[in-house]
Curated annotation (Swiss-Prot):
Belongs to the poxviridae E2 protein family. This is Protein E2 homolog. It comes from the Viruses. It comes from Fowlpox virus (strain NVSL). InterPro entries: Poxvirus_E2, Poxvirus_E2/O1.
Length: 717
């Protein structure tokens, strides 16, 4: 469990520097901790922005992904190579990679070259050689078939006008290439077609900057520019052109003010919604017409555009109802809470903004208090909150944050080490941490530091080899292309030692026939499995047995890319839902032995599957796995396979079967009826209506977490 008691004691024993920020105070205290404790905290995700040299070796040994916390000269090249080979996103290691520029350059590793070339500024000569070797026809064919290659070619090679025209007219590829520069007058239609079809600002700017002066100053280009302006397209980029080339100002119409000193009064024109949208974007260029524009928007109840010019609405027209209408209708163009007048920031408006996903809810503290946020069960904490000074202006907000996240090392790092917390707020945070640490509920929180005992299966074993196999003699076969693959080794070990109840293996043999490496065997079905319900109960017991012997699998086929969040306080359940949004499949199939990986390899597989940029501890991932197993079997099992009156007993059997599979003798008897009620609600809904983030089965999530906590403590005794 995340514990910073010693850090707090060290912090409180130091003398304060008046007005100083915790970055110097708390970080100094952190660096005085014993090395073993620092390693433990860093592994959990709690650490300052920099660490001193004395911690390098243990940190590199136990959490090599955190070497970016050290100065580049402290980092060993070997550890850097480990990081490069492990991660795809190396942005956190830029300084270290640049420090070892020479060593990486002479490493002769294509993987190092590929991953570091952008950071080190390598030029890809290999791509240039391939491009130059191809004929024009082959080049076009390859660009058509391989978009990635096409991007490289357009960036590196000057293409002929013929190729650019062919790629544009046949394949709709804009001529964003240096070959456009020498275009002649007879090809001007090609250029203006491409310019008119270009909608991205960067593409339009490229075409205008790369084309030669003769074409750029032609009447055809000027007309095309005016057509784009009249459509309200690429205004920011085209302002450059209008300011440098003589065009007919009268043709700019209502958009004249955007390009030149204000002249036109907006009421002189009949305005469409599209033109109003452009005008509102450049409202400061229409200062004389602002009252008319606002009146028009108000009269037409155009709240979406009013949201974009909210700072220009006259005070006499402002009221709470107007703000509520703007919030209700402006889904794609949310105004900032700071743009609202404080006297109209009501509790009702805050709830409405929260339900519509406003990130800056914390700014309601301009007029409301934290108690109002609490009363409405709103969680005001997100990335935006950390860009404000509210934690230093309102210590009640600090108290609320600590109550939510006092056992979450990552969230506590964000507050105590990454946010410039002032002395007063730091003191409040420390006091709140001490208060909540003393009242921790051990029945709800997982102890990651109590090592889970894995009973390893023997690594060396023999399986009988058969040259001739009669498939009629066997009811099961598992085949592989290679006998060197990871899945082959895992499957063979599981089949040989026959530890599962749902897959009782008899007459196992191995054969290499027709380039396939196959296991033939018979499965004996346990007498206790009479239907899907009993199958699931036996099956989750097998998942426990597999886990006990160090074999785990993922649940992404059911929960997608959702990752369990286990380090939050029970209080937070009332403010936000922490489970998966949906279930991809409401059917649980039989166990697939090919799907399992070894416990020691799980972090590497997890990193790849969920595309994260840091390594998680095996012990943490173990409980992610346990939590996901329980949630999957209780949720999908109860909803799909079990009658309502039997859900309570099914859940109890699922939990105890899993615990027994782990080799734990104790059992869990007490079960909240609220869990059953939540599952019945989900069961009654059509499958396409079962959005969990709307139903919020919080009691079910709490149950799964409580079982994890039980396994981490009582289950190991």
């Amino acid at each position: 469990m995340f514990d910073i008691t010693n850090l707090i004691e060290l912090y409180e024993s130091n003398d304060y520097v008046s007005g100083d920020y915790k970055h110097s105070q708390l970080q100094k205290a952190f660096l005085k901790l014993p090395i073993t404790e620092v390693v433990m905290l860093v592994k959990s995700g709690f650490y300052p922005s920099k660490l001193s040299k004395k911690f390098y070796k243990p940190i590199a040994k136990f959490c090599v992904d955190k070497i970016y916390l050290f100065k580049p000269e402290y980092v060993s090249l070997k550890d850097l190579f480990t990081v490069i080979y492990t991660f795809d996103d190396l942005s956190k290691y830029k300084e270290i990679i640049r420090y070892y520029y020479y060593e990486l350059s002479v490493s002769n590793s294509y993987q190092v070259y590929k991953k570091c070339k952008n950071i080190l500024g390598y030029k890809d000569e290999y791509d240039n050689d391939i491009i130059e070797e191809l004929s024009e026809n082959d080049l076009v064919e390859k660009m058509v078939n391989f978009p990635g290659f096409r991007k490289i070619v357009y960036k590196k090679k000057i293409l002929s006008i013929r190729i650019l025209k062919e790629m544009y007219y046949k394949h709709k590829v804009l001529p964003i290439n240096k070959g456009i520069t020498p275009i002649r007058e007879e090809d001007i239609c090609f250029f203006i077609d491409a310019l008119y079809d270009a909608h991205d600002d960067d593409d339009v700017l490229y075409l205008l900057l790369e084309i030669n002066e003769q074409i750029l100053d032609s009447d055809e280009v000027k007309e095309t520019i005016i057509r784009k302006i009249c459509k309200g397209e690429n205004i920011d980029v085209l302002r450059y052109y209008v300011s440098h080339y003589l065009i007919d100002h009268a043709k700019l119409g209502v958009y004249y003010n955007i390009f030149f000193s204000e002249r036109d009064i907006i009421s002189e024109y009949g305005l469409t919604d599209e033109s109003l949208k452009v005008i509102c974007k450049y409202i400061d260029r229409y200062s004389s017409s602002i009252p008319s524009i606002i009146k028009l928007l108000l009269d037409n109840s155009n709240y979406t555009l009013l949201a974009s010019v909210i700072d220009y609405i006259p005070e006499e027209r402002l009221n709470e109802n107007l703000y509520m209408q703007i919030v209700r209708h402006s889904n794609d163009n949310k105004p900032k809470i700071k743009s609202f007048k404080a006297e109209f920031l009501s509790e009702c408006l805050m709830v409405m903004c929260y339900l519509r996903g406003y990130e800056d809810i914390v700014d309601f503290l301009i007029a409301l208090d934290v108690e109002t946020i609490v009363r409405n069960r709103i969680n005001p904490f997100n990335d935006y909150t950390f860009t404000t000074d509210w934690f230093n202006k309102n210590t009640e907000l600090v108290r609320l944050y600590i109550s939510f996240y006092f056992i979450d090392p990552v969230m506590m790092r964000k507050l105590l080490f990454e946010y410039p917390l002032c002395e007063t707020s730091t003191t409040v945070a420390i006091e709140e941490l001490k208060k909540y640490r003393s009242s921790i509920n051990n029945n709800y929180n997982i102890d990651y530091h109590e090592e889970f005992k894995i009973v390893d299966l023997p690594r060396s074993f023999n399986i009988p080899i058969s040259e001739v196999v009669s498939t009629k003699e066997y009811n099961s076969i598992i085949s592989f292309i290679s006998d060197k693959s990871y899945k082959f080794k895992i499957t063979s070990q599981l089949l040989k030692y026959n530890i599962l109840q749902t897959i009782k293996v008899e007459n196992l043999c191995y054969s290499h026939i027709n380039n396939l490496h196959s296991f033939y065997f018979n499965i004996t079905k346990p007498s206790g499995i009479i239907d899907n319900i009993s199958r699931l109960i036996y099956q989750i017991g097998d998942l426990g047995r597999l886990l006990r012997h160090g074999f785990l699998s993922f649940t992404d086929n059911y929960f997608g890319k959702w990752i369990p969040s286990l380090n939050y306080s029970k209080i937070l359940d009332h403010y936000q839902y922490n489970g998966p949004d949906y279930v991809l499949s409401w059917q649980i199939g039989k166990l697939d032995l090919k799907a399992f990986v070894k416990y020691k390899d799980f972090p590497k597989f997890f990193l790849t599957k969920y595309n994260i940029d840091f390594l998680l501890e095996k012990e943490v991932l173990l409980y992610y796995c346990i939590y996901s197993y329980l949630l999957l079997y209780i949720l999908v099992g109860s909803v799909t396979y079990v009658e309502q009156e039997n859900i309570y007993y099914f859940i109890t059997n699922i939990i105890n079967s899993f615990i027994q599979g782990l080799g734990i003798r104790n059992s869990i008897d007490s079960l909240s009826e609220e869990v059953v009620k939540e599952l019945i609600i989900i069961q009654k809904l059509p499958e396409n209506k079962r959005k969990l983030s709307s139903i919020r089965p919080v009691s079910l999530l709490n149950l799964c977490k409580r079982v994890c906590a039980f396994i981490s403590r009582d289950g190991k005794k």
